[in-house]
Regions:
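Extreme N-terminal, non-catalytic leader segments
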Residues: 2-52
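Short gly/ser/thr-rich secondary-structure transition/capping motifs
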Residues: 36-39, 129-133, 179-182
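Short glycine- and Lys/Arg-enriched binding-loop motifs that mark or flank ligand-binding interfaces
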Residues: 47, 56-58, 74, 179, ...
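Residue-level preference for short coil/turn positions at secondary-structure junctions
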Residues: 49-50, 77, 143, 175
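Conserved P-loop
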Residues: 52-140
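Generic detector of well-ordered alpha-helical packing
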Residues: 86, 151-152
């Protein structure tokens, strides 16, 4: 007589019977109702209304682009916005060409360009400090609903700005003012202070395949 494997004793057979459409529909509805209950509860608990601090960091493409997308949304809601760029030094980009036609936007290109191009730490630090003076003016202006501090994180990486001073200024801003900070290698203290942090990971990048920066995609 053939012996049964001990693990096969009393093991129920998996059902292979197809689920009819009505049963599948009912199960889906039950799952979605449970999910809706959880989400509705979270929405009800999120009652605070104040300005938020967003940080877009990571090695992937799109940190600044995402911030400008939020700015478009803010303008659609009748808000006023300002942009201070800490590293970029180009004024011929597509985003500037587009947003310069919006009277609700103030835009300041205050960087000296990539550090490997300038090769002058004192000059880069002075530019960052001037940019922060402009940013601080907006942080004290309740008329600005959204402030984008583009590539600010590099000022901490290279020691151009004092992180504690920046965090104190951010904390003292008008209560309904939103701020978006972009750039790689966001310091942990900034991440801790932020309300929303997105870490954009680079999976692939066209530049590494030998494709040049393309208008409309990179600038």
């Amino acid at each position: 007589m053939a012996m049964k494997h001990p693990l096969s004793e009393n093991k129920p057979m998996a059902s292979t019977a197809p689920i009819d459409a009505d049963t599948a529909g009912t199960r889906h509805q039950d799952r979605m109702q449970r999910k809706k209950t959880v989400i509705d509860q979270r929405i009800a608990e999120a009652a605070a209304r104040r300005g938020v601090l967003l940080v877009n960091t990571g090695t992937g493409k799109g940190k600044s682009s995402a911030a400008f997308g939020v700015m478009a949304r803010a303008l659609g809601n009748g808000m006023h916005a300002a942009v201070v760029q800490f590293v970029k030094n180009r004024t011929d980009t597509g985003e500037i060409a587009f947003f310069r036609n919006c009277p609700q936007v103030s835009w300041h290109v205050m960087g000296e360009g990539f550090t490997w191009e300038t090769q002058d730490r004192a000059r880069d630090a002075a530019a960052a400090q001037s940019a922060w003076a402009q940013a601080r003016a907006y942080l004290n202006d309740a008329r600005i609903d959204l402030l984008i501090l583009d590539e600010l994180t590099y000022a901490f990486k290279y020691g151009w700005l004092d992180l504690d001073t920046v965090l104190a200024d951010l904390a003292a801003r008008p209560p309904m003012q939103h701020v978006i900070i972009t750039g790689r290698a966001a310091p942990q203290a900034l991440i801790d202070a932020a309300d929303t942090v997105t870490d954009m990971a680079m999976v692939k990048h066209a530049f590494r395949s030998g494709i040049a920066a393309m208008p409309g995609m990179e600038f």
